[in-house]
């Protein structure tokens, strides 16, 4: 609802679910779909009221929507197997799709079912005494899923089940009809609310003056559109390529690329920004979790570490991560600045210019610590900390003090959060920069440096621009020739572009830090009237608590609250049984989360869609320390029940609990491995910060780029995103990334001015 009105068709069609499809391209057979449907029915079966405890039974009987929710099965719901299969086939990482295909195909055969399910598929009464999975009773299918959930020696079934469960439940709780309605939202007390903003319905979007949305163009119009924006364009018909001449090309439009584009355009350079995502303004955001996460996030928000332990949340739209982040605007800690400047010898952090840059960035983003009203989860974090005598810190944010938007992770529909799309990129466009959307950088254009240049710069190569591809609407390629090239694709994509272009530095793709997190949850029944609201309401991060390990003076662990819509909640929640799943969802709106985020020592490596990452022993210990502290805070705040995201549904009732019982429970808490592990218990979490992979180094051996942001291998090639940061920093990195980009791009601007004079 919006101000008492239904959302209806608000927002871009790309950020709403499409109407029911009649044809599909998923490639699953009818038998595969039958097996898929049978799994989904066992995940969300009808639940008899007599199986519920008294408290839940009374709650269900008082609420018609909840009663209908408990009585229904997935096959009777708004979700069709074809649609779940289509999402799996088109959105998930190919390797996981292959696993799902294999599992479903095996289950279409009787012997295959015996292989994956064991003797539970035997039927002594009917020939041939073996049942296919779809022929088994609902109770037996549920038992099979419970086994798969714990069987480390059957990784194929466990991974396949995890993926089907995640996609199915995510779609089940995020699906909407053409009026943005979902029949189960009333049951779980969820609604999509958007505050009013007088600028929300403005006709012209902030970047319209400089943006070219290539998906809306064809081969006949795209060239003229670029010329109309003032670009010098020629056509190479033999290569089916348009050649563009400019001073600077920026690949990526997020926290790093947006700042670089603004600074370089302001200095008088002709700047072209290319972005593989689409452009949306506040009026375009639907606040709908499902389609927004698939459209606005890298790899549809389904990219994971190799062990399935962490999902990556990285922006893939004009504005990048600043569009989908949670507005936390924390400056680089002094201890980190000292480490990078003194111990690692990175010159950019050793001067007062960097600290001044942080002030300039915060001013441009309108960062404030003022807040009129805290949301449900932050109230709980604050209350729990105060009860325990712990320090709680107000989080600076790049939003207004009255901002109360719980859906900023899907793009801020009120426009009160100031991402690069409404700040730095506006500055760039106002200084004649051009932004091309749905434009993907394929390769950097590198040439051998001549002998004099090589001796002068010490670099064997020179970057001359970028080769890029456009949207599916045209086969034309782009060759963007530039005097300077800035890569800002983020830590997950920048390494691949550099490596595929022929750069060989050993630090490229390595040294990834992810600020890993583990979440704790606490259920606060409605009778607790002191804590108002619901988990999905209010600004996402307004309070935090720093946990200090006994042997450290630098906070390596931070406790914050996340954005977690019903789809994400359902996808991540451990599945113990169909009844338990429905009970957890019935409590969704009053289930608060606190996560522990660690400044990790462990490092990873990015190779395409595969991210290899391992925590160190110290990281594991810090996550466990943070998770236990989060649980203590939730209990102190008055939770009736608390738990973790361990696959067995680890939890504890809190009413009347004694301290010794709490400590006994906490002794069982740890940071479990991922689904691929050889462990009975596993977990899945997410990470919103990806750092490193092209880090700065004082020497070529220590980093992929130098202390001024330039590649050690290729002259006139710079990197301006989170991948340049030398280590993890332990706090939300937006201000650090933008301030680093500010310093790098100002140096580039000065260098270009000097060249012009020479």
From Swiss-Prot:
Tell me what topology the record assigns in the membrane: Multi-pass membrane protein
What are the subcellular locations of this protein? Membrane
Q: Could you tell me what reaction this enzyme catalyses? A: a long-chain primary fatty alcohol + O2 = a long-chain fatty aldehyde + H2O2
Residues at which FAD binds: 246-261
From the UniProt record, which GO molecular function terms apply? flavin adenine dinucleotide binding; long-chain-alcohol oxidase activity
- What's the Enzyme Commission number for this chain? 1.1.3.20
Q: Which UniProt keywords apply?
A: FAD, Flavoprotein, Membrane, Oxidoreductase, Transmembrane, Transmembrane helix
Q: Broadest EC class?
A: oxidoreductase
**Where, by residue number, is the active site?**
689
Q: One Pfam family from the UniProt entry?
A: NAD_binding_8
Cellular component aspect of the GO annotation: membrane
> What parts of the sequence cross the membrane?
102-122, 155-175
Give the protein's biological function.
Long-chain fatty alcohol oxidase involved in the omega-oxidation pathway of lipid degradation.
Tell me the protein family, please: Belongs to the GMC oxidoreductase family.
Q: Which PANTHER family match?
A: LONG-CHAIN-ALCOHOL OXIDASE, LONG-CHAIN-ALCOHOL OXIDASE FAO1
- Report what the protein is called: Long-chain-alcohol oxidase FAO1
Source organism per UniProt: Arabidopsis thaliana (Mouse-ear cress)
Q: Which gene encodes it?
A: FAO1
């Amino acid at each position: 609802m919006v101000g008492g009105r239904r959302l209806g068709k608000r927002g871009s069609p790309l950020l709403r679910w499409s109407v029911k499809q009649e044809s599909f391209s998923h490639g699953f057979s009818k038998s595969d779909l039958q097996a898929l449907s049978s799994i989904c029915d066992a995940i969300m079966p009808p639940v008899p009221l007599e199986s519920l405890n008294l408290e839940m039974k009374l709650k269900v009987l008082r609420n018609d929507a909840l009663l209908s929710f408990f009585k229904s099965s997935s096959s009777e719901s708004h979700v069709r197997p074809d649609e779940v299969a289509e999402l799996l086939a088109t959105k998930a990482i190919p390797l996981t799709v292959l696993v799902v295909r294999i599992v479903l195909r095996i289950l279409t055969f009787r012997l295959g079912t015996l292989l994956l399910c064991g003797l539970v598929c035997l039927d002594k009464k009917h020939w041939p005494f073996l049942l296919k999975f779809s022929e088994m009773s609902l109770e037996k299918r549920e038992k099979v899923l419970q086994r798969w959930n714990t069987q480390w020696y059957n990784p194929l079934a466990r991974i396949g089940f995890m993926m089907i469960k995640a996609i199915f439940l995510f779609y089940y709780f995020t699906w909407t009809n053409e009026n943005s309605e979902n029949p189960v939202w009333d049951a779980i007390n969820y609604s999509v609310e958007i505050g009013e903003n007088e600028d929300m319905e403005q006709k012209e979007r902030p970047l319209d003056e400089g943006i070219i949305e290539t998906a809306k163009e064809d081969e006949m119009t795209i060239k003229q559109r670029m010329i109309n924006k003032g670009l010098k364009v020629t056509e190479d018909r033999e290569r089916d390529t348009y050649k563009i001449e400019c001073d600077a090309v920026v690949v990526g439009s997020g926290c790093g690329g947006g700042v670089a584009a603004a600074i370089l355009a302001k200095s008088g350079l002709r700047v072209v920004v290319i972005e593989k995502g689409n452009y949306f303004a506040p009026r375009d955001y639907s606040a709908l979790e499902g389609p927004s996460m698939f459209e606005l996030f890298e790899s549809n928000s389904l990219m994971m570490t190799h062990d399935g332990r962490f999902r990556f949340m990285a922006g893939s739209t004009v504005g990048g991560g600043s569009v989908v982040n949670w507005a936390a605007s924390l400056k680089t800690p002094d201890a980190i600045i000292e480490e990078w400047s003194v111990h690692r010898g990175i010159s950019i952090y050793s001067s007062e210019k960097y600290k001044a840059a942080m002030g300039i960035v915060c001013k441009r983003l309108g960062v404030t610590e003022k807040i009129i009203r805290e949301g449900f989860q932050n109230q709980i974090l604050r209350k729990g900390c105060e009860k325990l005598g712990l320090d709680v810190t107000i989080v600076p944010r790049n939003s207004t003090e009255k901002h109360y938007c719980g859906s900023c992770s899907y793009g801020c529909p009120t426009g009160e959060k100031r991402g690069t799309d409404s700040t730095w990129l506006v500055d760039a466009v106002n200084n004649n920069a051009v932004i091309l959307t749905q434009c993907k950088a394929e390769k950097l254009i590198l040439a051998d440096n001549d002998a004099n240049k090589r001796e002068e710069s010490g670099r064997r190569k020179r970057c001359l621009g970028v080769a890029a591809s456009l949207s599916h609407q045209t086969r034309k390629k782009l060759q963007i020739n530039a005097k300077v090239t800035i890569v800002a694709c983020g830590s997950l994509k920048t390494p691949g572009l550099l490596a595929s272009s022929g750069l060989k530095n050993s630090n490229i793709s390595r040294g990834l830090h992810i600020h890993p997190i583990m979440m704790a949850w606490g259920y606060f029944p409605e009778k607790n009237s002191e804590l108002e609201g619901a988990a999905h309401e209010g600004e996402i991060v307004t309070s935090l608590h720093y946990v200090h390990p006994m042997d450290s003076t630098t906070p390596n662990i931070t406790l914050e609250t996340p954005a977690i819509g019903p789809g994400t909640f359902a996808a991540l929640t451990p599945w113990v049984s169909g009844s338990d799943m429905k009970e957890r969802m019935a409590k969704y709106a009053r289930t608060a989360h606190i996560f522990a985020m660690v400044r990790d020592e462990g490092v990873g490596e990015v190779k395409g869609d595969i991210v290899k990452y391992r925590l160190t022993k110290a990281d594991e210990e810090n996550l466990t320390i943070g998770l236990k502290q989060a649980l203590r805070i939730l209990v102190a705040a008055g939770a009736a029940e608390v738990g973790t995201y361990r696959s067995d549904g680890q939890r504890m009732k809190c009413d009347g609990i004694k301290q010794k019982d709490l400590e006994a429970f906490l002794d069982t808490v740890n940071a479990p491995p991922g689904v691929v592990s050889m462990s009975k218990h596993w977990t899945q979490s997410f990470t919103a910060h990806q750092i490193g992979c092209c880090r700065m180094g004082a020497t070529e051996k220590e980093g992929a780029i130098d202390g001024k942001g330039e590649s050690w291998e290729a002259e006139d090639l710079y990197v301006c995103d989170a991948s340049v940061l030398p280590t993890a920093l332990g706090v939300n990195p937006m201000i650090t990334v933008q301030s680093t980009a500010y310093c790098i791009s100002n140096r580039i601007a000065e260098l270009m001015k000097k060249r012009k004079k020479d």
